[in-house]
Regions:
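Conserved short alpha-helical segments that host acidic/polar catalytic motifs at enzyme active sites
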Residues: 1-207, 213-276, 280-281
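PRPP-dependent phosphoribosyltransferase catalytic core
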Residues: 144, 159-161, 166, 173, ...
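Phosphate/ATP-binding catalytic cores across multiple sugar-kinase/actin-like superfamilies
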Residues: 146-149, 252-273, 286, 291-294, ...
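Terminal amphipathic helices with adjacent charged low-complexity linkers/tails
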Residues: 218-234, 279-314
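Short glycine-rich phosphate-binding loop at a beta-alpha junction
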Residues: 270-283, 401, 495-501
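Extended, hydrophobic alpha-helical segments in both membrane/secreted and soluble proteins
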Residues: 277, 284-291, 295, 329, ...
Length: 531
């Protein structure tokens, strides 16, 4: 970076002086708060970027907030701010959270000011005492009382205190590392391991309902802020979002692939000789590795059986022929690594998917082979229908089997993932199509009235009636219909879609059982309301 190079060249003697660095080089404070964000419920613009800042001339009243979160009850929280005497101008959970924390930060400042004023201190002395004595935990306890959602909330105060608070269900991930010199909190464990070169055992998970609190003087405490509830850590983090180089996530994604083996073998009628295996996108590579390992085990059992059948008639040619059998694995479809269609805004996604994929030619026997391609998830099906299936069809496979390492995504996420609109899910479209095809439209009218009735109840009493839409059909029936909906009219190959089972998901990711987007079982009352 030119700023650092120029600073060192112009001030070689002062460059290693910490106080000089703080005054002259960017990002050299004791506290650093950064965040990577793209729009989920909010917009993709500079105004949506974290951290958010609440300014004040009093040092201890300044506040920066950044977070990985969505709250489901913004309307309720805004009403509470109005009850407190505020007049919010923006309806957004980021601003609402900042103002809630800011309100109780102001109250804590007022309490301490009064306390030290009564002791006879002047205003300058009082400011210093406030900075030493602010009770960050009590501010967070009061601020978070009505929050409903999944969140890891990080904040810094102008005088130098900082905190990171995790939701009581542990929906959003948070990890921390601490030694004599640094304390770091991040949403992903391998990032901490890489930057600080530390062992996995030295990186701890921030407990649900707890806050990591760092005081200006460097003291650290981990304090319970909210009563922890049933752990429902987000399983989609493990399937797709989080880095695949986390030791546990790597193993879990491999298992997700392994659990698909029986369904895949059935789909190809156990004909491995005429089947080619591949994957898309790159994030599916680890799950694909697990799938291949499972297929390999199946092949090895066949080899062992064939060898035993030879008995005394074993010969080198026969043995070589048996041992030469193995799954056919190719990098069939290539994706531009710079493009990620899942996190592209809806208007751009359709145009983008046609530009980012290409295929490897002469890898498939025309009109003979079945082509099996693993994807980590199928949310909208946009990429498959608009681009991937047509591109794969150019290789002239007899059949295309698309397998998802995630179960069918059936319900909206309201805790921080870009899966917010029910009607855009291909699984929802499939269920609605089946209802109409079987003459059961009355179910939809009944559910619509039930949903309206639920919304009249307090959110704590609401149930997710949308689940009834899917109960009429089996998972296999919905998967088959998804295949019908995603198949382009000009596709020559047969098409089959296979999804991970809920059992396979839970067996693979036993510590992350949050599965509301698959099952509709939301961990907070606000989730049912959103659905």
């Amino acid at each position: 970076n030119d700023l650092y190079i120029n600073a060192k060249q112009k001030n070689p003697d002062a460059y290693n002086d910490i106080e000089w660095q703080k005054k002259n080089i960017p990002f050299m404070g004791e506290l650093i708060l950064g965040h990577l964000r793209y729009g989920t419920y909010g917009g993709n613009n500079i105004q949506s970027c974290h951290p958010f800042r609440r300014q004040n001339n009093w040092m201890a009243r300044n506040l920066l907030v950044a977070g990985n979160f969505n709250l489901t009850n913004v309307d309720e929280l805004l009403e509470h701010l109005v009850e407190l005497g505020q007049h919010p101008t923006v309806k957004a959970d980021t601003v609402t959270v900042m103002e809630k924390i800011g309100h109780f930060l102001d109250k804590e400042n007022d309490r301490l000011f009064k306390q030290f004023k009564e002791k006879g201190l002047n205003n300058f002395e009082i400011s210093k005492e406030i900075q030493k004595n602010i009770d960050v935990a009590s501010i967070l306890v009061e601020s978070s009382k009505r929050w409903d959602g999944g969140y890891v909330m990080a904040g810094m105060m102008g005088h130098g205190d900082a905190f990171v608070l995790r939701d009581p269900n542990g929906i959003r991930p948070a990890y921390m590392y601490k030694d004599d010199e640094v304390l770091v909190v991040a949403s992903e464990r391998p990032v901490i391991q890489t930057v600080f070169n530390v062992d996995i055992k030295d990186v701890a998970e921030l407990k649900p309902g707890y806050a990591a609190i760092i005081k200006k003087d460097g003291t650290f405490t981990e304090q319970q802020i909210i009563e922890p509830l049933e752990r429902k850590a987000c399983s989609f983090e493990r399937i797709y979002f989080s880095r695949g180089n986390d030791a546990d996530i790597y193993r879990e994604r491999q298992q997700l692939g392994r659990y698909l083996v029986p369904q895949v073998l059935k789909a190809i009628d156990y004909d491995l000789e005429n089947t080619v295996f591949s994957y898309i996108p790159n994030t599916a590579e680890v799950a694909f590795g697990g799938l291949v390992e499972g297929i390999d085990e199946h092949v090895n059992k066949i080899k062992a059986t064939e060898i035993l059948k030879l008995g005394a008639n074993v010969s080198e040619p026969k043995l070589s022929q048996i041992l030469s059998s193995h799954p056919r694995i190719h990098k069939i479809i290539l994706k531009d690594a710079k493009q990620r269609t899942f996190i592209t805004d809806d208007e751009s996604r359709d145009n983008l998917v046609n530009l980012v994929y290409d295929i490897t030619y002469e890898t498939v026997k025309k009109d003979v082979d079945t082509l099996v391609v693993l994807d980590d998830s199928i949310v909208r099906g946009t990429t498959l229908k608009q681009s991937i299936l047509r591109i794969l069809d150019r290789l002239h496979p007899k059949k295309i089997v698309i397998i998802s390492s995630a179960p069918q995504i059936r319900y909206p996420d309201c805790y921080g993932i870009d899966m917010a609109i029910l009607s855009k899910f291909i699984a929802f479209d499939a269920a609605i199509s089946l209802i109409k095809e079987t003459g059961k439209e009355s179910i939809l009218n009944s559910l619509y009235e039930k949903a309206k009735a639920e919304l009249l109840k307090p959110k704590e009493e609401q149930i997710n009636v949308v689940q009834e839409i899917y109960r009429t059909f089996t998972n296999e029936e919905i998967s088959e219909k998804i295949g019908d909906l995603l198949k382009p009219k000009d596709l020559k190959a047969d098409l089959q879609i296979i999804y991970q089972t809920i059992e396979g998901l839970h067996q693979s990711c036993p510590d992350n059982l949050g599965d509301w987007y698959f099952t509709g079982n939301y961990p907070t009352p606000g989730g049912n309301k959103v659905a």
